[in-house]
């Protein structure tokens, strides 16, 4: 019998390199990435609002306080996905802006909606009233905060998870290179093994739990598992035949349980 350490060494020494193929990201969940995936662009691709509120120019709020207030005329409402272009901009103007909407070039800060004072009323707002100075870039989410061009989105050898897919889709990456899913056949061995579904079994027998466990464990790792059944100890020819058949098939790995000692 060889040691566990020696067994691992032999497995690594005789391991094979599985081929790679390009697939759509819709089919990539739990597959193993075959090469580093880099961001082709920055994300977000533009500066946008991190809050619902009003976009303003911080320069125009300079010197404001409770005794010195200013009205800002509401020009329009910009929701996420709207064209933010302002055809005619006048000093001391503002736009209502929703979370994720592109920040127009005339503005550089956001006043959250919870802090807004409307004029003449909230039901009929024409202006907002401000009584304090706003800092530049408050509540602004910058383009490239999540990813910059060339950043690693998915590493080689990493298993693709749901959080990777949302990033890949957001960056417009449609396909990635992944490793072929290993196909493994498993055989239980031993004269004592019988079907686990049998209700009453002889005292000297044991129910087959290994095949079910290996199949479930393999599927949990996104491996393709083939249940080869059970081969008796006194049927070595069947084991040999199964091994020969496997070598002629598309099976990548042949696994058996049992036979850990001289017996």
Residue ranges of predicted features:
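A glycine-rich phosphate-binding loop feature that marks nucleotide/adenosyl-phosphate handling sites
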Residues: 25-29, 184, 234-235
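Short, low-complexity N-terminal leaders and the immediately following helix N-cap/first helix
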Residues: 1-68, 108, 123
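Short, glycine/charged-enriched hinge/interface segments at domain edges or termini
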Residues: 55-227
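Short glycine/threonine-rich loop/turn motifs
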Residues: 191, 211-263
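Generic structural signal for well-ordered, non-membrane alpha-helical segments
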Residues: 1-8, 21, 25, 47, ...
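Hydrophobic alpha-helical scaffolding
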Residues: 1, 18, 140, 204-208, ...
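A generic alpha-helix structural signal
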Residues: 8-12, 29, 75, 113, ...
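N-terminal intrinsically disordered, low-complexity, charge/repeat-rich segments that act as generic
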Residues: 1-14, 201, 214-218, 253
């Amino acid at each position: 019998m060889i040691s566990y350490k020696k067994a691992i060494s032999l497995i690594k020494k005789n391991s094979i390199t599985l081929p790679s193929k390009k697939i759509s990201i819709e089919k990539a969940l739990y597959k193993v990435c075959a090469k580093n995936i880099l961001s082709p662009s920055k994300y977000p691709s533009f500066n946008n609002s991190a809050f619902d509120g009003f976009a303003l120019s911080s320069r125009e709020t300079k010197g404001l306080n409770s005794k010195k207030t200013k009205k800002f005329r509401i020009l329009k409402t910009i929701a996420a996905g709207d064209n933010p272009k302002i055809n005619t901009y006048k000093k001391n103007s503002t736009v209502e802006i929703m979370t994720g909407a592109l920040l127009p070039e005339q503005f550089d800060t956001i006043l959250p909606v919870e802090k807004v004072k409307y004029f003449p009323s909230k039901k009929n707002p024409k202006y907002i009233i401000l009584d304090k100075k706003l800092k530049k870039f408050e509540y602004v989410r910058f383009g490239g905060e999540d990813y910059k061009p060339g950043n690693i989105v998915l590493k080689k050898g990493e298993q693709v998870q749901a959080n990777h897919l949302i990033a890949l889709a957001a960056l417009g990456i449609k396909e990635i290179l992944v490793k072929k899913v290993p196909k493994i056949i498993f055989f239980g061995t031993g004269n004592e093994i019988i079907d686990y579904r049998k209700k009453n079994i002889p005292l000297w027998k044991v129910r087959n739990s290994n095949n079910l466990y290996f199949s479930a464990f393999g599927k949990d790792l996104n491996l393709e598992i083939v249940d080869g059944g059970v081969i008796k100890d006194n049927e070595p020819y069947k084991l040999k035949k199964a091994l020969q058949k496997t070598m002629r098939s598309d099976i990548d790995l042949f696994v058996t349980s049992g036979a850990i000692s001289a017996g």
